[in-house]
Amino acid sequence: MRQLKREVKIGNVTIGGNNSIAVQTMLNVPVEDIEGNVAQAKRCEAAGCQILRVTCPSAADAKCIEAVKNAVNIPIVADIHFDYKAALACADVGVDKIRINPGNIGDDDRVKAVVQACQQKNIPIRIGVNGGSLEKHILAKYGAPVPEAMVESALYHVRLLEKFDFNNIVISIKNSNVPRMMEAYRQLSAVTDYPLHVGVTEAGTYQMGLLKSGMGIGGMLLEGIGDTIRVSLAAEPEKEVEAGYNILRAVGFPVAGPEVITCPTCGRTQYPCTEIANEVEKRLQGYKKSIKVAVMGCVVNGPGEAREADIGIAGGKGEAVLFIHGEPIKKLTGDHILDQFMDEIYKI
């Protein structure tokens, strides 16, 4: 059962409570390239990104935040490290949320200045704790970025914001070690009702990043923990968005658009099952209808394995049996099985 947290409004997206889990990503174009950032932001929006983070190393770079915000219709989060004046500048241009890493933002007076700027414009703050940048005294106490250390850091900074009468807060507590990350989120969720942004930081190259994020983020969601997610990948941010939705779909959350399932194939396979499955998925990109499509290798296990699909095929030599809701309908034959199958999919 999902652990319900208080609601926080980020631009036109509300997280927490019973609201849908929002999928985020972060631009990776150099901040000086405003045109490139705007173009990438538009691609992320088209891919379905719901909340978009943009780095802002200095106050002067707030002009990039402003340009991106004016170019898309999704909330923009300013990612702030070290320079608290960058956060103030982003608040001035109307950013929708500010993410700070409390371990490097500076003394309490600087944090207070950021809080006051956000209070004036009702801008939420994400406390972004990262296992790689914990405060020195906390690392000295625990010896490593263990879950208890990360939770202590997060709660310290929550109390700091609360001391300044600020509770428009989101928390993340990321680590590149999946078991540590999961245990940290468990401990944090047990003691706070602020919404949680879930992710695995520094997850690695694309393939390993997908695996670690699937385990970490998916595992947390299955435990009912998480209100917004970001899949961190060494890849284009549009790929992070796609991966985020795939994780949501894999753990049972309703996601608009098609899901293509296929078997791993074996020696019984007599038609290009994998190639057809990949091509079906490619052709269905951007298709908005929520359907499950199965491409199975043979008629031995295929029909049973695809019974929960809306439509599917199970192949044989030069032919494939078409199934709709688990029932065999007809055979598709010849050199154009893929095209025939796509025609049937669009009829569903």
What are these regions (language model features)?
Residues 85-126:
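Hydrophobic or amphipathic alpha-helical targeting/insertion segments
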Residues 18-36, 55, 74-82, 138-151, ...:
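Active-site mouth loops of central-metabolism enzymes
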